């Protein structure tokens, strides 16, 4: 499979991500007893977004010098589209985390610890999923049609099917975990495991971490095929995806207090998924350029946010 990713680009990306992760973990480790404040979350969100844009600029410059301006423009638009897609779809992931932390009564200072390991695990799992997906696409090009159909069905289902409101503790997988793993009734600070009466017990914190990882894999099943609709270049797919999820922890603490106000978001995301699915299904008849995909995704998100603001204002007026 043709890829813009040269050893220099792969190496630069790996070094940059490693340095930023170590810096982030080092700074957060000094404040492990504190919850991330809204201000800290905002600062880190700006840092991660700025770093992503700087990477896009560096990618454009490198491609311009090596393969020409046209390819540079195309690759950067693909990166930005993938990044925006992942950021948008990740908001739903944030809502699931909020429900998990609320159900298991995890305090904010311990949420930070869970999300640190959660994001690190997501990096590993998504890397494996993306390379597996790239291999499948390179071997079986028709699989893109399956991705497209899956995204179209998922988009329609997201808009029309009512969400499952049953308690998290009643979910089959949670019941299975509790039946097969010794879990303490109470939290033990930041510890994932404790010994009681000579036996090793898991704390509720490790249960939440497992569920956080599972939720990320479930959402990745939607987001990764969506990015393959934009580009099949594994370098662009991986870098756009990882840059988006690296800022996910900061996004969580940024949105935690206002999550209930995003009532219309799922409809916007459903339209995006349906659009991407249709784009993949009609690829042989009509090719939507990358710039068109980027514009469509950005426009759908913008319209969704405007409608969301209007709905919230209307509800506030009705409640007065």
UniProtKB/Swiss-Prot annotation:
The chain crosses the membrane at residues 3-23, 41-61, 88-108, 114-134, 136-156, 199-219, 226-246, 271-291, 292-312. Its main location: membrane. It comes from the Bacteria. One of its GO terms (cellular component) is plasma membrane. The keyword Transmembrane helix applies. InterPro entries: Integral_membrane_TerC, Integral_membrane_TerC_rswitch. Keywords: Cell inner membrane, Cell membrane, Membrane, Transmembrane, Transmembrane helix. Has been proposed to be a redox modulator. This is Putative membrane-bound redox modulator Alx. It comes from Photorhabdus laumondii subsp. laumondii (strain DSM 15139 / CIP 105565 / TT01).
